[in-house]
Amino acid sequence: TAKAIAAFKDKQEYLTDFVRNKKSPRVENPIKIIAIPTTSGTSSELTCWATIWDKEKNNKLSLAHKSLYAEKAIIDPSIMVDKPLGLTISTGLDALSHSMESIWNINANPVSASHAIQASKLVLENLPLLTKDLRNVELRSNIALACVHAGLAFSNTKTAIAHNLSYPVTLNYGIQHGIACSFTLPMITKSMVGIDS
C-alpha cells in the first residue's frame, strides 16, 4: 500500500524483510502522508495501519506504526460517486464490520463504543439507499462520515473475529474484503447480544 511505501521510503528492503521474514519493521524518516480516500470503508486515512496482501505466501500482514497516521486526511464524498455498486457495498460493509467489531471488542471503551454505534447506524440507514442511488452525494457523505466514526472506533479497539475469519476467504476465493467480513457478522452479533464483559 501507499502507506507502507511512505513508511519505508528509500529503505524498501526493510519492507521486504517485514513481509518475507515478519521481522519487526524499522521505520526511518517516513514520508508524511496526506490521505485522500476514494472509497469509504478501510478508514486507513485515520489509522496507524498499513495492510499488505502477500499473495505469494497467501497471507495478509498488518504493519502498525505511529508514522502511518496521516498528517492530513481530506475526505471528499464527491470523488466517490463514480464507484460501482459492488465496490460500494463491499467498502460499506467493511465500515460496518469495523464498527460492529468495535462494539463487542474486549478493548471497547465509552469513546470507541460511541463512535462505533454512530458508524453502525449511519451505514445501516444509508448503505441500502446508496445502492439504489450511487451518485447521491448526501448518501456518500453519510457513508464517509460512518467510515470516519468506524475508523476512530477501531483505532481504539482493533478489529476482531469477523476480520480474522475474512482473510482466508479473500485470499483463497478472491471475495472482496468487506463482503468476506460481513459473512459472519449476523452469527457473531447474535452470539454477542446480551453479553457484557
Language-model features: locations:
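A general structural signal for well-ordered alpha-helical segments in protein cores
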Residues: 2, 93, 120, 162, ...
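Short, well-ordered alpha-helices that flank and scaffold nucleotide-derived cofactor binding pockets
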Residues: 3, 7-11, 156, 167, ...
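Glycine/threonine-rich beta-strand-loop-alpha-helix active-site module
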Residues: 1-78
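Glycine-rich phosphate/pyrophosphate-binding beta-alpha loops
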Residues: 41, 148-181
